[in-house]
Each structure stands twice: as C-alpha cells, then as structure tokens.
Amino acid sequence: MRIVLVDDERTFAGLSPGDVILRNSDSALLFFSKLHIEQQMRYGDELFAIYLDHDLGGDDDIRIVVDFLVLCPILTSHVFVHRQNPTTDWIVQTLFKAGYNAERVALPELA
C-alpha cells in the first residue's frame, strides 16, 4: 500500500520510494484528480492510505481537497487527519459521511 501525505512542512519517517508527498492543495488536487480518473478506468487499483494536514501554509488549506474527495471518491483504505487543528472534526465527519474510513490521529513519527 502506498501512502499519500498532504502536508506543507512535515515528512514522515519510514516512507517508501513509492509514497507521495504533496505540499499544497493545488498539487493534491492534481494528484487526486488523476488518480480518480485512473481508478475509474481500471477498477481495483492499489489502495492508498492518505494523511491530511489542514494548514498548508499561507492562505492554503485542505478544505478544497476534502470537497474534491467527497465529489470524486478515491479508493483508499484509510484517511488519517492530523488532530492538531480545530477543523479536524469537520474534516473527519465530512469524509466519513462520504464513505471514507476517516479518523483523527496524532502525527506519526517525523523524519
């Protein structure tokens, strides 16, 4: 299983070469839109564990990515939302209602 990390600052320890780090909402939207199309064309592709950070630097945040994930579902085993931001509950509830296995988590060990 590959991991997709959407975070403007952090990199987790133990990431594999196939894992993906996205630093802002624009790169996350591009990545997830391509993945959504690929999954729609070839059902059953590799599942991803997705880690989301709310604050992506400056005025950028994860909300537009969450909206996209609700409208264009991604086949994934888990979505983990870093629990250091007050909007975490909204993100988890929104994704859970859309069918994702979403939960609040502490930050994994950083690299």
Enumerate the language-model features and the residues they cover.
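Catalytic phosphate/metal-binding cores of nucleic-acid and nucleotide-processing enzymes, i.e., regions
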Residues: M1-A111
